[in-house]
Amino acid sequence: MRREDFVFCIGYEGNAAIVDGRLRARNAGRSTRELAEAGLYKQALCSAYWSRKPEELEEVLQVYNSRTEHPVSSSAELSRIYGISGIPEGAAKIKVI
């Protein structure tokens, strides 16, 4: 799985990752911070997980908290809100829709 596939993945079907092709085409070149600033928090979190840099997770948290009426206390809490737990193993195929 490539970074762009993971970042724009919307779910899984068996061992196939389902990727939002339109969203990926429009935003694939954006950095983690750029995704967060565009309001694409789920995608920004996925990008931060892919980078394996804790400071990117904190950056997403800061951007999120600066724009919401309901700030969260940690990047782990924000990840739970968006259903992100890390990079999944075993996605052998990519389906773009």
Where are these regions (language model features)?
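Extended alpha-helical solenoid/arm regions of large eukaryotic scaffolding proteins
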Residues: 1-97
